[in-house]
Amino acid sequence: MCLLCELKSSSNAAADSTHRWHPRRAFLLAAGAAAAAPALAQVNVGGSSEVRKLVPAETLEGSARQQYSQVLAEAKSKGALAPDGHPQLVRLHTIARRLIPHTTQWNPRARDWKWQVNLIGSKQLNAWCMPGGKIAFYTGIIDQLQLDDDQIAMIMGHEMAHALREHARERLAKSQVTSIGLSVASQLLGLGQLGNVAADLGTQLLSLKYSRDDETEADLVGLEIAARGGYRPEASVELWKKMLAANGNGGPGFLSTHPSGANRIQELEANLPKVQHLYQQASRG
């Protein structure tokens, strides 16, 4: 299982529902008023690529809002959208309130995001966060993995990190650049359809390394956000051990678009000492 944050079609996102719930009201979480003071990042993930600026953040976040609304509408039509007061949804909201104040250091735009957290009844082991802070969890990942609050916080922090680091924006921008560049080259060289095939392969190879780095970055940023929120850093390792048990290790990391479970655990364990004091400070506070 690879945790992704990308613009998904409403049909895929709301499929496989296993619960039916009554209609509910929208739930919004604002980051601005409760934002924590800027703090020095403890994990080292480097800077974001400038190429992402080819895709306007406002445009992408607007598209995300529309897609998110469609996902919720479809889930609601199937009775799969958790109502206000549902115990698992209350858990998610409580965790989100503790994490959101620590998001703005990773992206100043997050101060103005209208964070939303929803729960969809589905057997899928999945959770995601669209640009602009639109989060969805599926009951399958909580129930089947029997996640405690600390482990849920690690998933939520990971998904938030994808949005905060603008991975979807960067992915789309790089895709545009690659498509335009390879298309022009194919025409100039007269490669025709052969050029298109090569272009498709090249796009896959370019995205392979990018996506693996993306996931590692989200793991580490999410770990720090969760630790600052007062959730045990060790829960990140526990989570991925559960993932391995549920899904297998998926082969070596270089054969996947994301790091293998074993590689993720190793990277997380190496970074636990960097955030342990953040958890301790939050626990005392």
Label every PLM stretch briefly.
Residues 2-285:
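A Zn2+-metalloprotease active-site environment signal
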